[in-house]
């Protein structure tokens, strides 16, 4: 049984401020495979504080600096492919070969795709030739990222990597019933050398850490994938602080992307 009670905050693995153990079950064996801690408001506040402080310098990094870190992260991810497969297989109870070919590969694929997109992305595009006007794309700020259990590293990569790429800092709350892949990803991020506070991880449940993140005045955006019920609660809780809310709820709200969406 794995002891995974610590959180990743401000570049360090730290003990929870208010211990609240939670057993993670391997569905294939129906046995306890790990013990994590469900975070408290104090833990969330520490992570948000670290992310807010780190944002002041991270937002000023160049595209080239961020690309270098993402490319290093991709190298580490591929080197630890089997570790990621083992983590997901344990938390989901899925067949190992299928997990490697589908779950683990999705994480690497998303990192590769966002690296390519960042390489070509213009953060200050102009309008018509000769126009003095132009658009400046700026990072949103501190992002609260809440991911589901069923495609853990897929959803984590889809939220974390574009946040990195655009100069945002973040707090990740992976699903408490499938937290192992997210914690392993945090190890990879640390090894890649991302500055302290840019990425933080606090385990917890929706009513606890999820509520704290969605209502926190220093969180500028919440991205959530999960149930419609939880999405409604997050939207309501976020309203008082007028933060951006991005929801993918049980297949609701599908997007149609046309061929001319990007130049």
Model features per residue range: what roles?
Residues 1-131:
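N-terminal Rossmann-like NAD(P)+-binding subdomain of aldehyde/semialdehyde dehydrogenases
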Residues 123-263:
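Rossmann-like NAD(P) dinucleotide-binding subdomain of oxidoreductase/dehydrogenase enzymes
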């Amino acid at each position: 049984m794995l002891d995974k009670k610590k959180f990743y905050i401000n570049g360090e693995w730290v003990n929870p401020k208010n211990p609240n153990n939670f057993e993670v079950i391997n569905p294939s064996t129906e046995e306890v495979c790990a013990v994590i801690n469900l975070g408290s408001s104090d833990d969330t506040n520490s992570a948000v504080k670290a992310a807010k402080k780190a944002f002041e310098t991270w937002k000023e990094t160049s595209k080239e600096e961020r690309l270098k870190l993402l490319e290093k992260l991709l190298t580490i991810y591929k080197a630890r492919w089997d570790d990621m497969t083992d983590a997901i297989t344990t938390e989901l109870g899925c067949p190992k070969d299928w997990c490697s070919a589908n779950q683990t590969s999705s994480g690497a694929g998303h990192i590769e795709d966002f690296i390519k997109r960042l390489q070509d992305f213009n953060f200050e595009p102009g309008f018509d030739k000769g126009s003095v006007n132009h658009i400046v794309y700026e990072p949103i700020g501190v992002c609260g990222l809440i991911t589901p259990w069923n495609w853990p590293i897929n959803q984590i990569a889809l939220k974390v990597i574009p946040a990195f790429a655009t100069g945002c800092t973040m707090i990740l709350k992976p699903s408490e019933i499938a937290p192992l892949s997210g914690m392993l990803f945090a190890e990879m991020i640390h090894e890649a050398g991302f500055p302290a506070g840019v990425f933080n991880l606090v385990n917890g449940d929706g009513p606890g850490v999820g509520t704290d993140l969605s209502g926190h005045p220093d969180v500028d955006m919440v991205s959530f994938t999960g149930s419609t019920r939880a999405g409604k609660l997050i939207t309501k809780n976020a309203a008082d602080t007028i933060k951006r809310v991005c929801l993918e709820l049980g297949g609701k709200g599908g997007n149609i992307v046309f061929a001319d969406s990007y130049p």
